[in-house]
Curated annotation (Swiss-Prot):
The lineage of its organism: Eukaryota, Metazoa, Chordata, Craniata, Vertebrata. It comes from Bos taurus. This is Matrix metalloproteinase-9. Residues 491-504 have a biased composition (Pro residues). The conserved cysteine present in the cysteine-switch motif binds the catalytic zinc ion, thus inhibiting the enzyme. The dissociation of the cysteine from the zinc ion upon the activation-peptide release activates the enzyme. The gene is MMP9. Pfam families: fn2, Hemopexin, Peptidase_M10, PG_binding_1, PT.
Length: 712
């Protein structure tokens, strides 16, 4: 990718070179924040041919013969007209969205035939894209595996840990495997051939819009469509809509048709919207109230003011300052832009561009045909923009292709086959005879007469959501989601929207069963100690104890870690809870897990946080104000940003420089009641801060002083 261009609006003026009048050329705009490339067609071809294995180097000789040979090889491989020239057909093929696996050669080179030598293949969905509901992603992957199990003896079982044969991951740009993605469009995904470690894994570019190939997938609530997804585009009163709308309503409730023609079918539902419900917070899912007052100011829309993590929230009464009731606003997938310089923001309609007003996404100003919108009311003034949601790429089809690689298949030269390198949307059965012959060459045909779906295990998960209020913690998050709302509605967009929230929420956490026979005072050295929900937790070998609230017994437990956090390993190195978002980070070896309630992100490698291979483990964490955390390893610490989930690489600091007097080597570092604790063996050094100076104010025993164990 070329460097970002200066934020300058430049119009390309085409000079008239003839007295004959010409049709006015479209205005082409250099959009601020958009990566641009000045590659010539030859440079594009050389880069492409090298990347996908057709040439040994990125630059070819000037005589043109080596380029011609490479082009012929490329054209022959992909069943294109064999001209040996950089013609329009060849250039269009090079610009088409495709798989990132090389056509010639492999990511990893091994001798012999690469295939799995067992038939029950396991897979793990390590993380999720926010483009689709998790249940839709789970289903897309299960259906993709089912294509291959229907024609082979293979079965596919979902597991929940890195021991899986195939680890599925969404990532952006450089995502830890040495084969970076390239942003929106272009390279969609890649996978590695069978084997240990990263071999067999499948990675998907999360800068793409993932859908089922026919636009964003938006579930509906209430209405009369029984939760069916929106159908885009749809027709209402003779007009076509490609996003949820408030037209036809007087209450500003967003709705959509769930068929192509609302006028004919009258099937509709309400779209996720802050006027329908809020998420988490402390208002039991009640909808936003607009306008509302916060710190004396009036707000007529969701805002991130008062927060350092960028989450959009609203008050659920007219006065937050008085009532302190709030919730987080649902994401508008149908109107959230990607790319540009305002990714994640909402389109604002109408907006002004070059003096003209636009009430929908437009292609004006672009020569690539992509729809875009401004995210403020005036692009000419603010220069804030992004790409509008398009049809997206079918996660099911791309996954089925990548899983073919994960099973040992190469690209084919048959354009109609699933394993052809270029993306092609189809609603027909995607497996071609060529695909079936290839996979059965490796594993043989399915012995059963009737194909069956793969063996899978599914769980219901929820999107991670922050739970802290705009400024200070008012109350904890609700223990249960709001009760079910109405399930039926009028046949047309009603005059008033339902008052209830979505009809489903996360399931309750497993009941903990303490075993009093196991005494915390018998534990020698704990694996990790952390303050979670304002209570000190002690972790050891898959179990944990916690200090009780108020009076009564001082220590509760032990509890099984997996009863509360099922994905965690038996051995933990450290943990911390971010006081702002209530996210809980758990570290073990070179991996980190992030829990928000029952929702999980990870495990992720420490590389994702910006911690290099020299960091073998994170031995402690000290939360700091405004979403910052100090992460410790060995004799150093780094400053970590919870919002970006990245460390500042320039922040590495010796521990004794900021915390003089603590041991050189510590195994548990945690914060409790606003003081830092550094543990070594059975002892801890407590550090307090006065006038921005840290000093040890107490040295004590973990068992006797923190746990109040008897000294005899």
């Amino acid at each position: 990718m070329s460097p970002l261009q200066p934020l300058v609006l430049a119009l390309l003026v085409l000079a008239c070179c003839s007295a004959v009048p010409r049709r006015r050329q479209p205005t082409v705009v250099v959009f601020p924040g958009e990566p641009r490339t000045n590659l010539t067609n030859r440079q594009l071809a050389e880069e492409y041919l090298y990347r996908y294995g057709y040439t040994p180097g990125a630059e070819l000789s000037e005589d043109g013969q080596s380029l011609q040979r490479a082009l012929l090889r490329f054209q022959r491989r992909l069943s294109l007209p064999e001209t040996g020239e950089l013609d329009s057909t060849t250039l269009n093929a090079m610009r088409a969205p495709r798989c990132g696996v090389p056509d010639v050669g492999r990511f990893q080179t091994f001798e012999g035939e690469l295939k799995w030598h067992h038939h029950n293949i396991t897979y793990w969905i390590q993380n999720y894209s926010e483009d689709l509901p998790r249940a839709v992603i789970d289903d897309a992957f299960a259906r993709a595996f089912a294509l291959w199990s229907a024609v082979t003896p293979l079965t596919f079982t979902r597991v929940y840990g890195p021991e899986a044969d195939i680890v599925i991951q969404f990532g952006v740009r450089e995502h830890g495997d040495g084969y970076p993605f390239d942003g929106k469009n272009g390279l969609l995904a890649h996978a590695f051939p069978p084997g240990k470690g990263i071999q067999g894994d499948a990675h998907f570019d999360d800068e793409e819009l993932w859908s089922l190939g026919k636009g964003v997938v938006i579930p509906t609530y209430f209405g009369n469509a029984k939760g069916a997804a929106c159908h885009f585009p749809f027709t209402f009163e003779g007009r076509s809509y490609s996003a949820c709308t408030t037209d036809g309503r007087s209450d500003d409730m967003l709705w959509c048709s769930t068929t192509a023609d609302y006028d004919a079918d009258r099937q509709f539902g309400f779209c996720p919207s802050e006027r329908l419900y809020t998420q988490d917070g402390n208002a039991d899912g009640k909808p936003c109230v607009f306008p509302f007052t916060f710190q004396g100011r009036t707000y007529s829309a969701c805002t991130s003011d008062g927060r350092s993590d960028g989450y959009r929230w609203c008050a659920t009464t007219a006065n937050y300052d008085q009532d302190k009731l709030y919730g987080f606003c649902p994401t508008r997938v149908d109107a959230t832009v990607t790319g540009g310089n305002a990714a994640g923001e909402l389109c604002v309609f109408p907006f002004t561009f070059l003096g003209k007003e636009y009430s929908a996404c437009t292609r004006e100003g672009r020569n690539d045909g992509h729809l875009w919108c401004a995210t403020t009311s005036n692009f000419d003034k603010d220069k804030k923009w992004g790409f509008c949601p398009d049809q997206g790429y079918s996660l099911f089809l791309v996954a089925a292709h990548e899983f073919g690689h994960a099973l040992g298949l190469d690209h084919t030269s048959v354009p109609e086959a699933l394993m052809y390198p270029m993306y092609r949307f189809t609603e027909e059965h995607p497996l071609h005879r060529d695909d079936v012959q290839g996979i059965q060459h490796l594993y043989g045909p399915r012995p059963e007469p009737e194909p069956r779906p793969p063996t899978t295990t599914t769980t219901t998960t929820t999107e991670p959501q922050p739970t802290a209020p705009p400024t200070v913690c008012v109350t904890g998050p609700p223990t249960a989601r709001p009760s079910e709302g109405p399930t039926t509605g009028p046949t047309g967009p009603p005059a008033a929207g339902p008052t209830g929230p979505p009809t489903a929420g996360p399931s309750a956490a497993p009941t903990e069963s303490p075993d009093p026979a196991e005494d915390v005072c018998n534990v020698d050295i704990f694996d990790a100690i952390a303050e979670i929900r304002n209570r000190l937790h002690f972790f050891k070998a898959g179990k944990y104890w916690r200090l009780s609230e108020g009076g009564g017994r001082r220590v509760q437990g032990p509890f099984l870690v997996k009863s509360k956090w099922p994905a965690l390993p038996r051995k933990l190195d450290s943990a911390f809870e971010d006081p702002l978002t209530k996210k809980i980070f758990f570290f073990s070896g070179r991996q980190v897990w992030v829990y928000t309630g029952a929702s999980l992100l990870g495990p992720r490698r420490l590389d994702k946080l910006g911690l290099g291979p020299e960091v073998a483990q994170v031995t402690g964490a000290l939360p700091r104000p405004e979403g910052k955390v100090l992460l410790f390893s060995g004799q150093s610490f780094w400053r970590f940003d919870v919002k970006t989930q990245k460390v500042d690489p320039q922040s590495v600091t010796p521990v004794d420089q900021m915390f003089p007097g603590v041991p050189i080597s510590t195994h548990d570092i945690f914060q409790y009641q606003e003081k830092a604790y550094f543990c070594q063996d059975h002892f801890y050094w407590r550090v307090s801060s006065q006038n921005e100076v840290n000093q040890v104010d107490y040295v004590g025993y973990v068992t006797f002083d923190l746990l109040k164990c008897p000294e005899d």
